[in-house]
Amino acid sequence: MTTAIASDRLKKRFDRWDFDGNGALERADFEKEAQHIAEAFGKDAGAAEVQTLKNAFGGLFDYLAKEAGVGSDGSLTEEQFIRVTENLIFEQGEASFNRVLGPVVKGTWGMCDKNADGQINADEFAAWLTALGMSKAEAAEAFNQVDTNGNGELSLDELLTAVRDFHFGRLDVELLG
């Protein structure tokens, strides 16, 4: 993937996560993203899986802030966010990506797995992606692309691979909104 494509995808993510539109990402923006996801799944703010997701997004913010040199009470500019994230993708590689983004994917996956069977079926996946603004038809097509073993269900590993592949330019299905 070219740096231009990565930068475009990361700019889109920055804009989505900048909830208050002030041109910077703060911890509150990451907390609001976790809340937004929880609400999309109809989860109560006090639910354990909501707290897990909030903690995961908090950890992601802490990582980004530390790498940008702004501290956990600071804020990241778009340039800092893109620089740190491109470094994660292009320099540090897949293992680091999994370590940093894995908890966020796992937290979202936990909310998506409504029947708690350890897998995400096509209906659960569609509920997630339609909450992000995709049509049901787009969600069905995305499921088919992400279900790499073709068993009609997604494991946590398949989902993390899909998120990573999007950021590495190997997949065009955006799963984190």
UniProtKB/Swiss-Prot annotation:
It comes from Saccharopolyspora erythraea. InterPro entries: EF-hand-dom_pair (IPR011992), EF_Hand_1_Ca_BS (IPR018247), EF_hand_dom (IPR002048). Keywords: Calcium, Metal-binding, Repeat. The lineage of its organism: Bacteria, Bacillati, Actinomycetota, Actinomycetes, Pseudonocardiales. PROSITE patterns: EF_HAND_1 (PS00018), EF_HAND_2 (PS50222). The keyword Calcium applies. Ca(2+) 2 binds at D113, N115, D117, Q119, E124. Residues 5-40, 45-90, 100-134, 134-169 form the EF-hand domain. Coiled coil: none annotated. This protein binds calcium. Ca(2+) 1 binds at D18, D20, N22, D29. This is Calerythrin. Gene3D superfamilies: EF-hand. GO terms for molecular function: calcium ion binding. Ca(2+) 3 binds at D147, N149, N151, E153, E158.
